[in-house]
Amino acid sequence: MCLITHSSALSKAEKPIKCYKVLIKGYGDERLTPIQKTQVPKSILLGIKTFKAEGIGILRPANWYYYATWGFEYVAEKGFIHCFKTLDGAAEAAKPRFRCEKKYRFEIWEVEIPAGTEYVEGFYRYSLMGDTSLDMLECVAAREIRYIKPMSGK
């Protein structure tokens, strides 16, 4: 799962950008970001603080896993928090695809990218091999996001 973009340049948000974040609910109260497998602190879920991306990765050129025709694209992975530009896109991406476990739960949160935060826009790629129906979901990856309110969940 990653964001694919045609630009290797980061932008800075001039004003807060509204988007939607999918959190996977694991066992107990654990909530993970699907990309980073990073547990989200409970204080974040209360809307107290912003959540900064972990990891040192920035944008890297698409490697041999991506077909040769995609060689000019870049991948935003570690160091970014991946969100969706629309609520419908977040809901589509949150559906379990290959592992339909009974304990699978998710939450979708309305979030914002604070003004001044570095971000990049692109499209969501769910899997290199498998379901390609998600390839055109509009996605934004930012260095930092602020949780606003939960929108839906299962």
Feature locations, PLM:
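Conserved NAD+-utilizing ADP-ribose enzyme module
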Residues: 1-81, 87-154
